[in-house]
Amino acid sequence: DEEYLMESNEEAFRLDVKTDIESVEKQALWAGIKPGMRVADIGCGSGKTTAILHNLVQPGGVVVGVDGSEKRIIYAQDHYAAQGIKFICKDIREPLGDLGLFDLVWVRFLLEYYLSNSSDIVENISEIVKPGGILCLIDLDHNCLNYCGLPPKLERTIFAAMRVLGEKANFDPYAGRRLYSYLYKLGYQDIDVNVSAHHLIFGRLRDSDAFNWMKKIEVVSRKVNYQFEEYKGGYEEFLNEFMRFFTDPGRFVYT
């Protein structure tokens, strides 16, 4: 049974740090969230997004956060428990019918970790959307692959590493472009699409971006045991060059 790519003792904290309240609210309102709704947050992680969605369905709404990690469900319960919020540990690849039906099912930054089976996962999740309800899929496209000012050796290494992630860790850096087709093939009506930048990094590096990207590089490099062949000093030399680029206020990065 494959392990979640970003699994680490600090993953719940990383998810908390990187989750921007304003962005989640804007996306949820665009998707059609309203007071009184029953909402499922699939792949809820730390529970921060679940709490944001809960605020948007008040008065009278409830949100169920679902995640496959018992550790993150405990973290979510410790940090975001409230009346009208329930957290459940469950494998989202297995049947979800016992959760009941929902007015809105929210799936954000989850499918990128399931390159080979994301279509099946969406079909499974779709079973808990009530007739006339909303299934909102949000994910990144060309993930961690858009840079200006990247030294050639660093660029080759990053692109090669992303290919290895697809081969060894079921990771999909192009998940975003596939979302429309999933909904279309399942027969959804009134499908709408919105495309915007998620990572948008220029000028002074924010502490939250520095922590998030450092943690991603650290965890992913260890998980897939990637060999930094162009760097005689291996991972440490690669990391030093990446951080010189990433902390330079003249660089530009977006996803």
Residue ranges and their predicted role:
Residues E2-E22:
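Class I SAM-dependent methyltransferase Rossmann-like catalytic core
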Residues K18-M37, I52:
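Conserved alpha-helix/loop element of class I SAM-dependent methyltransferases that forms part
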Residues A40, S46-P95, D120:
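Class I SAM-dependent methyltransferase SAM/SAH-binding core
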Residues Q58, Y114-L115, V129-P131:
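Helix-to-beta-strand junctions that scaffold the AdoMet/dcAdoMet cofactor pocket
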Residues L96-V105:
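A short acidic, Gly/Pro-enriched loop at the edge of an enzyme's catalytic core
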Residues S119-I134:
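A short glycine-rich, Lys/Arg-flanked "PGG" loop and its adjoining helix->strand segment in the class I
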Residues C136-L205:
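Conserved catalytic/acceptor-binding region of the Class I
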Residues D192-T255:
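Conserved Class I S-adenosyl-L-methionine
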